[in-house]
């Protein structure tokens, strides 16, 4: 029997801002309550969807503290805490642990394009610097290079608190290798809402989701249906929401999902540069789908 710590429906939480660009902590608390009431399993602030590249260390720590306070004991808080400088990544990981995070999501170093041994040493040093679980985040589309399956598996076997991977490579050969060869208690999560159904069919453990910001009950329902073996139910959910999953990436994440949340009355539509609002034509396309789904 597996005892995987990371599983189910996790939301990659947006960071709401006021018009002056400061963090809207009142809206942040509302979002966390929204997920608590929806039954979301894990809330993950300060990731890509949370615009972490434009947050200061101090802002990230305060966001994590507020999210932990609002989540209480009903949801795990796994905070984004990654950087392409290993020393900085260690600092962020320690800050997240101190702020109350129960786990961290550590992105693969970007821009540097390290070797596989470099990836291994980076994640080893980060994991050994904290006492909480570490989730590796492999997202070649943003980082510019791939952490190979064997490197991830080596980390999973060698380092006790490396407990999961958010695998967003879209490489199903790599995904199957991770699922088939992993240690028993190591979780494999997808980072792609549109791939939830096939990913779970292969034996995946869940999703770290963008769409859960808008439709947390839907995402949890799809994951739970797949876990229970209710394939037809999961297919029906996927069929209904597949276009929304795709339109959330009609422009760079998190711009579309934040626009949607603003239409839903949950946050103001404010981004930090270099992110800017969507083109009007794309706004119209996304709004039409939200209206079709009765979300606005």
Swiss-Prot record:
Protein's pathway: Amino-acid biosynthesis; L-lysine biosynthesis via DAP pathway; (S)-tetrahydrodipicolinate from L-aspartate: step 3/4
Keywords: Amino-acid biosynthesis, Cytoplasm, Diaminopimelate biosynthesis, Lyase, Lysine biosynthesis, Schiff base
GO molecular function term, any single one: 4-hydroxy-tetrahydrodipicolinate synthase activity
Cellular component aspect of the GO annotation: cytosol
Keyword Transport: no
UniProt-listed GO biological process terms: diaminopimelate biosynthetic process; lysine biosynthetic process via diaminopimelate
Binding residue positions for pyruvate: 49, 208
SMART domains: DHDPS (SM01130)
Broad enzyme group: lyase
UniProt site (Part of a proton relay during catalysis): 48, 111
EC number(s) on file: 4.3.3.7
Subcellular localization, as worded in the UniProt entry: Cytoplasm
Residues the record marks as active site: 137 (proton donor/acceptor), 166 (schiff-base intermediate with substrate)
Keyword Iron found: no
Catalysed reaction, written as an equation: L-aspartate 4-semialdehyde + pyruvate = (2S,4S)-4-hydroxy-2,3,4,5-tetrahydrodipicolinate + H2O + H(+)
Main location: cytoplasm
Domain of life: Bacteria
Assembly mode: Homotetramer; dimer of dimers.
Function: Catalyzes the condensation of (S)-aspartate-beta-semialdehyde [(S)-ASA] and pyruvate to 4-hydroxy-tetrahydrodipicolinate (HTPA).
Family as reported in the entry's similarity comment: Belongs to the DapA family.
NCBIfam families on file: dapA (TIGR00674)
Protein's UniProt name: 4-hydroxy-tetrahydrodipicolinate synthase
């Amino acid at each position: 029997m597996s005892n995987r710590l990371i599983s189910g429906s996790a939301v990659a939480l947006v960071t709401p801002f006021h018009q002056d660009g400061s963090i809207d902590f009142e809206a942040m608390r509302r979002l966390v309550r929204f997920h608590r009431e929806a039954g979301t399993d894990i809330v993950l602030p300060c990731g890509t969807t949370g615009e972490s590249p434009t947050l200061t260390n101090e802002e990230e720590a305060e966001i994590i503290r507020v999210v932990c306070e609002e989540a209480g004991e009903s949801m795990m808080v796994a905070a984004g805490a990654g950087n392409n400088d290993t020393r900085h990544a260690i600092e962020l990981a320690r800050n997240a642990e101190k702020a109350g995070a129960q786990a961290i999501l550590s992105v693969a170093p970007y821009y540097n394009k390290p070797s596989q041994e470099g990836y291994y040493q980076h994640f080893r040093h980060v994991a050994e610097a904290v006492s909480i679980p570490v989730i590796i985040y492999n997202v070649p589309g943003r980082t510019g290079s791939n952490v190979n399956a064997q490197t991830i598996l080596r980390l999973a076997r060698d380092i006790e608190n490396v407990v999961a991977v958010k695998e967003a490579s879209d490489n199903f050969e790599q995904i199957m290798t991770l699922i088939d060869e992993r240690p028993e208690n190591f979780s494999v999560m997808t980072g792609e809402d549109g791939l939830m159904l096939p990913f779970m069919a292969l034996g995946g453990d869940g999703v770290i989701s963008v769409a859960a910001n808008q439709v947390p009950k839907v995402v949890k329902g799809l994951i739970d249906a797949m876990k229970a073996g209710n394939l037809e139910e999961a297919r029906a959910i996927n069929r209904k929401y597949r276009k929304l999953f795709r339109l959330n990436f009609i422009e760079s994440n998190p711009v579309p999902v934040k626009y949607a949340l603003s239409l839903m009355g949950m946050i103001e539509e404010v981004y930090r540069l270099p992110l800017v609002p969507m083109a009007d034509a794309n706004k119209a396309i996304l709004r039409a789908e939200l209206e079709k789904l009765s979300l606005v």
